[in-house]
């Protein structure tokens, strides 16, 4: 065989390699505007950078652009300014509405045609895959707009399945959520998966371009435009440095700009020094300077912060309605605080030190099975917070109490209780709280 033929055969796998992207926004409602704006911005970056449209899979509720509160119907903006681009224009949503669930996300990732009836990941061992998830989270869990949450146990199993099915040469996973650093506990250092998270496993992520900073073309959107970690990496990508900038350099830049939480990276860092363009290809002609993020708010407080801003800025006609909305959000937060305090009290009995430990400790997640079971009990039995657009017992605020469930699981031996007994405590307290809520409503 001629030398040239041998060389061509050796180059054939890389020449045939494809680039894929899976993007998911896990929330719904206008208060969560930023998540769908983030997702569409990510879609535009993938498309603009040369990833084939048929290789980009986007799932989100897709309700914000058409929401009656949107001052620009049919449009979404991910940054402020008079020249801010409409990221919704040309943003092709593959899965929208009530079908967007955690299970659908997992089915798409693993190429399961039984569960996902539309586009799925069809990548091979020669391909590179980029996954981007944006939404609310807590220790070991992230939310979806419909159905149950996604647990770290399920995500871990899915990534291992993708590895065993040889679905990628390299996979990069960017996750925007509170406590997102808790979602990748067992990535191998040589597993060809690099995960980057908006926060560590014990802190909130942050929204940005909120309040007075949410001005677009002379109008205030009335909701945060983006998330600090997400806009940081995307506005960095918008600078058009893909061909030369490495993942390591981008992570360092994004870490510096994401100054309210600790950006973390997990897994295989052997390709950190490779150019981002190897995963996402290279952008040309994008040289605008990224504006510095302003108006950042702890993601846990965005609902109450936005409601307060809306009340302050409401006209006389809307003042009472805005106040009622603000009061409802504050009351719902207080109910969540009280509910999880009661769960801790019931588990501990009359032991103040134990209660303090259950509610305040930052134990590490080890017993995933127990934590998953208790988290499911909250989803199934606790009151649904309409003010937080929740579809189960978890919402963007109370997901911070996922840590309490972790503490219960890791302390169950000292408590003298098994998983079933802890589950019963949650069922009873949530059912009682739900009954009180229904009586009030």
What are these regions (language model features)?
Residues 3, 9-441:
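Cysteine endopeptidase catalytic domains of the caspase/legumain-like
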């Amino acid at each position: 065989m001629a030398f040239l033929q041998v060389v061509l055969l050796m180059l054939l796998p890389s020449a045939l390699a494809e680039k894929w992207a899976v993007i998911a926004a896990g929330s719904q409602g206008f208060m969560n505007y930023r998540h769908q704006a983030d997702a569409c911005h990510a879609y535009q970056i993938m498309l603009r950078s040369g990833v084939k449209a048929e290789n980009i899979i986007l799932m989100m509720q897709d309700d914000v652009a058409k929401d009656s509160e949107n001052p620009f119907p049919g449009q979404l903006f991910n940054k402020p300014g008079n020249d801010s681009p409409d990221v919704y224009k040309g943003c092709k949503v593959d899965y929208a509405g009530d079908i967007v669930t955690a299970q659908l996300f997992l089915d798409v990732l693993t190429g399961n045609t039984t569960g996902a009836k539309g586009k799925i990941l069809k990548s091979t061992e020669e391909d590179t895959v980029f996954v981007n998830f944006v939404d609310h989270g807590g220790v070991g869990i992230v939310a979806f707009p419909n159905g149950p949450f996604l647990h770290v146990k399920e995500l871990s199993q899915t990534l291992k399945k993708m590895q065993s099915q040889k679905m990628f040469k390299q996979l990069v996973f960017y996750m925007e959520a509170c406590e997102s650093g808790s979602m990748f506990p067992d990535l191998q250092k040589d597993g060809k998966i690099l995960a980057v998270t908006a926060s560590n496993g014990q802190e909130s992520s942050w929204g940005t371009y909120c309040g007075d900073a949410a001005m677009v073309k002379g109008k205030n959107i009335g909701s945060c435009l983006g998330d600090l970690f997400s806009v940081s990496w995307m506005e960095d990508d918008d600078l058009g440095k893909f061909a030369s900038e490495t993942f390591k350099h981008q992570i360092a830049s994004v870490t510096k700009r994401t100054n309210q939480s600790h950006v973390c990276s997990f897994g295989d860092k052997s390709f950190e020094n490779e150019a981002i363009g190897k995963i996402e290809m290279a952008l040309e002609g994008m040289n605008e300077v990224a504006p510095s993020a302003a108006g950042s708010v702890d993601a846990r407080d965005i609902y109450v912060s936005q409601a307060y801003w809306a009340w302050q800025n409401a006209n006389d006609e809307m003042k009472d309605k805005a106040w009622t909305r603000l009061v409802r959000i504050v009351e719902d937060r207080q109910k969540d605080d009280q509910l999880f305090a009661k769960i801790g009290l019931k588990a501990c009995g009359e032991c103040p030190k134990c209660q303090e430990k259950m509610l305040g400790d930052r134990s590490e997640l080890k017993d995933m099975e127990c934590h998953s079971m208790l988290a499911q009990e909250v989803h199934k039995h606790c009151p649904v917070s309409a003010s937080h657009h929740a579809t189960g017992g978890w919402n963007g605020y109370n997901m911070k109490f996922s840590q309490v469930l972790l503490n219960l699981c890791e302390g169950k031996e000292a408590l003298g209780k098994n998983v079933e007994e802890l589950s019963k405590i949650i069922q009873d307290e949530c059912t009682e709280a739900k009954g009180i809520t229904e009586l009030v409503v």
